[in-house]
Amino acid sequence: MPGSPETPEQVTAVEQRSGHLEIIGETAAKLLLFQQGWNPYSRFLDQDKVDIILRRNRDNQPEYREIQVKYRRLYTPSKPSRWDAKLFSAVAWYTADIDEFAAHRASLFVMFVFGYPDRQIEKDVLIFPSRAFHEIIQQSPRHKKEGDKRALFMAKAKADGRWHIMLTRKKFLEIDNVSCINVHQYANNFSVLD
């Protein structure tokens, strides 16, 4: 493609000039939400965990939703011999405070936009109501042995493309209710905003 970086040095130079990755996530989220009939507005200040305010008219009545956008890089298991490479095609992680979304508001949603290291955007996004996301955080393993932060490992299953959040940081041999939470109902489910 004309104008695309050709060498690893050119790719690195482009990455160094690129804006903050969160901006990429918010821009992708705005486009996706606009395609779903919402009018997205950016907040000048990131207050109350809100990056984007959505507005639309339904039956001549305005509706509003608040979105916290999380952009996360997806990594493909680098070695086919790794245990996770047998189960997952891509993995992203997010570290959360245990009570990060404890203050529930029915209008608040958490949207994950994923990108690969080459800046290609994953076609799937995850959209969680804040209460559901808080409950998932509570079930997730500790980030470190001490402290209240939780480690959320979001992974796309190799077999069927369904999304899961791992319940353990230890090796497991199959995807089941003990090893993972199936969160595929939140993948590209824009109707959760209704």
State where each predicted segment sits.
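Mixed-charge (Asp/Glu-Lys/Arg
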Residues: 1-48, 53-194
